[in-house]
A protein has these predicted regions:
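Terminal or standalone catalytic/regulatory effector modules within metabolic enzymes
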Residues: 1-124
């Protein structure tokens, strides 16, 4: 139910990292931009804005973020990102795998969002 339509994340020396994000949630498209302390932080801030402004809902709290690269990994090694989320006391752990660390985190985030949307749809 939650699809990533497009995104751009940027980082530049001397400038704050930013993200432009377009997502589709339950068939409706939303777009937002944000800056943050890093690319992923900016990405999540844009998603939080969408959930708050357009959906009038909370966004689960990121509780822990762990990145692992296999021993002996090179610059093109797969990165595993495991993110622990807290949704009003309910703990959820999702994993993303990609050669790019930010993309791995984004994959883990969208796994969480689809679980979150499925649970919220069932409650209605």
């Amino acid at each position: 139910k939650v699809k990533l339509v497009s995104y751009v994340v940027s980082t530049a020396y001397g400038l704050k990292p930013g993200a432009n994000v377009k997502v589709e949630i339950n068939g409706q498209q939303y777009e937002a931009a944000a800056t943050g302390d890093g690319q992923y932080d900016a990405f999540v801030k844009a998603l939080r804005f969408i959930y708050r402004k357009y959906l009038d809902r909370t966004f689960p709290l990121l509780q822990n973020y762990a990145v692992s690269i296999p021993p002996g990994g090179r610059t093109d090694a797969l990165v595993q990102t495991v993110i622990t989320w807290n949704d009003n006391g309910k703990i959820l752990r999702t994993r993303g795998l990609d050669a790019d660390q930010t993309e791995a985190a984004i994959k883990a985030t969208f796994k969480m969002l689809n679980i979150y949307e499925n649970e919220n749809t069932n409650e209605l």
